[in-house]
């Protein structure tokens, strides 16, 4: 990745808030290439009434004591945490790629329960999925507006489902205005 950065004067890491491994790779590549880096933080999804947990494992532990079907809108990497739950209750929404489908198979998810689609999803589509599969619990990450968090929140309310939100990893960075100012300041210095 460092080779890709050579010739660039700056880099902005605007990856998903949960893409810690990718962000670490970007930091290492920028350090190796000598390219200044800023982390752009997404605005959080806002307040909601629901359950907030720190990890997929904590969500699974909580849901093991609850009744009802569960929509797992967390990606395929989080599925192993839910392997101790009755798989007929689990409805993972994953990308329609072999890697995600294989993760579902490894987790013992019945094929009829796999929802393989590209997002982000509208409020109406989220609500339709919640109603179609009689979802009582929707497990999601707080991807902010870009990740469709508001649509998930509204759809859960519409369908009478409860949200279980996996909190963001701790990270440092800047908001959009600060990152833009940093980029513009560097551009102005180049022109002088």
Task: Annotate each language-model stretch with its function.
Residues 2-59:
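Glycine/small-residue-rich loop that forms an oxyanion/phosphate-binding "nest" at active or ligand-binding sites
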């Amino acid at each position: 990745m460092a080779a890709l950065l050579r010739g660039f004067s700056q880099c902005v890491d605007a990856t998903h808030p949960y893409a810690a491994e990718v962000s670490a790779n970007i930091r290492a590549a920028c350090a190796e290439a000598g390219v200044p880096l800023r982390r752009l933080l997404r605005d959080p999804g806002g307040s909601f009434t629901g359950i907030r947990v720190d990890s997929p494992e904590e969500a699974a532990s909580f849901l093991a004591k609850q009744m009802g079907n569960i929509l797992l809108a967390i990606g395929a990497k989080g599925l192993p945490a839910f392997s101790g739950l009755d798989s007929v209750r689990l409805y993972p929404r994953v990308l329609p790629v072999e890697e995600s489908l294989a993760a579902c198979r490894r987790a013992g998810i019945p094929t009829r329960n796999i929802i393989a689609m590209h997002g982000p999803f509208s409020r109406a589509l989220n609500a339709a999925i919640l109603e179609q599969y009689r979802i009582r619990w929707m497990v999601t990450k707080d991807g902010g507006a870009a990740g469709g968090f508001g649509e998930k929140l509204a759809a859960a309310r519409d369908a009478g489902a409860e949200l279980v939100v996996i909190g963001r990893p701790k990270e440092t960075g800047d908001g959009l205005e600060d990152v833009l100012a940093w980029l513009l300041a560097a551009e102005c210095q180049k022109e002088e």
